């Protein structure tokens, strides 16, 4: 009887641990995906980089994308 109770408790602990780990592993956004509404959801190898959009000198919005860490993007004419 004690063995059955012990086995049940061990199985319960294992299932609880697996469920807790699954909750912590949220889907992340890969490179070049839009992260404007979720800046903390980019995968670990990329960072959410935001850029302001301007028209005639007035700011009209911003765009955020998951981009490689440490990479500098420059506009080409």
UniProtKB/Swiss-Prot annotation:
MF GO annotations: toxin activity
Positions of the propeptide removed during maturation: 21-26
Family: Belongs to the neurotoxin 19 (CSTX) family. 08 (U8-Lctx) subfamily.
Name of the protein in question: U8-lycotoxin-Ls1d
Gene Ontology annotations for the cellular component aspect, listed alphabetically: extracellular region
Family matches, as InterPro entries: Spider_toxin_CSTX_knottin
Organism listed in the record: Lycosa singoriensis
Cellular localization per UniProt: Secreted
Family matches, as Pfam families: Toxin_35
Superkingdom field: Eukaryota
Annotated tissue distribution: Expressed by the venom gland.
Cleaved signal peptide residues: 1-20
Post-translational events: Contains 4 disulfide bonds.
Keyword terms, alphabetized: Disulfide bond, Secreted, Signal, Toxin
Principal place of residence: secreted
